[in-house]
């Protein structure tokens, strides 16, 4: 293993993924409160070359909490700096759903990729017509960004009606805005035209999108079932234990 100053690990690429999990909350008297979002972060160096069938992450580290986005990102950066020589990281790659707090990164040179799972999920939510769903998915998978956005506008126009209860056009335009606002991240990180440094020995680079499964196995199964409700402090403390 290569190390830099203060024995921090030297890596060429750092993969980062972030997502939010909405939890049922309660106050100090156990009275039900509005749901609040727990922020979850996973970083890793790549995938184990010898465990490709299992897609084992190398150097996986997680962080989760109920803090404000500013404080959460400060903790995230501190976690990265504690483990790695950040001056030697040549490329950071961020995968997320496009939420405003997720894109508040400290590194303007990081590559942003819109999470594929969330794109597919939004297509299914916003478009009911199966043939239109299929066309949107195909255009997305083929990396035809402009054609996808144009298709959504044409589809929205084609189903527009004066019936206020018919929300097909409105939903399609919402999907268009979501994708257009995250246009720079619609292509996978390896197809965005930036040269990615070669992986270290024993590591391979694959498609990102591990956060949903990490959420499920680490947080969701422990904190969202059996009608659980949490205080902010309790949720943060439990997240710290689960991510340790």
Model-derived features with residue positions:
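Catalytic center-proximal scaffold of phosphoryl-transfer enzymes
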Residues: 1-244
């Amino acid at each position: 293993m290569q190390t830099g100053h203060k024995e921090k690990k030297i890596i060429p690429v750092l993969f980062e993924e972030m997502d939010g999990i909405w939890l049922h909350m309660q106050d100090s008297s156990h009275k039900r409160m509005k749901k609040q979002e727990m922020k979850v972060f996973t970083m890793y160096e790549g995938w184990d070359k010898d465990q490709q069938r299992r897609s084992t992450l190398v150097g996986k580290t997680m962080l989760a909490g109920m803090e404000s986005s500013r404080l959460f990102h400060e903790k995230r950066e501190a976690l990265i700096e504690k483990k790695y020589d950040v001056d030697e990281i040549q490329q950071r790659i961020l995968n997320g759903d496009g939420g405003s707090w997720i894109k508040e990164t400290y590194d303007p040179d990081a590559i942003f990729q819109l999470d594929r799972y969330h794109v597919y999920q939004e297509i299914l939510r916003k478009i009911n017509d199966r043939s239109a769903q299929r066309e949107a998915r195909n255009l997305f998978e083929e990396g035809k960004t402009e054609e996808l956005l144009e298709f959504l506008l044409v589809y929205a126009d084609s189903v527009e009606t004066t019936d206020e209860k018919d929300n097909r056009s409105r939903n399609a335009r919402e999907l268009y805005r979501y994708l257009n606002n995250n246009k720079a991240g619609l292509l996978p990180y390896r197809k965005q035209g930036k040269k990615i440094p070669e992986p270290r020995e024993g590591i391979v680079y694959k498609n990102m999108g591990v956060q949903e499964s990490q959420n499920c196995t680490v947080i969701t199964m422990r904190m969202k079932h059996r009608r659980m409700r949490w205080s902010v402090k309790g949720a943060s403390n439990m997240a710290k234990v689960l991510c340790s």
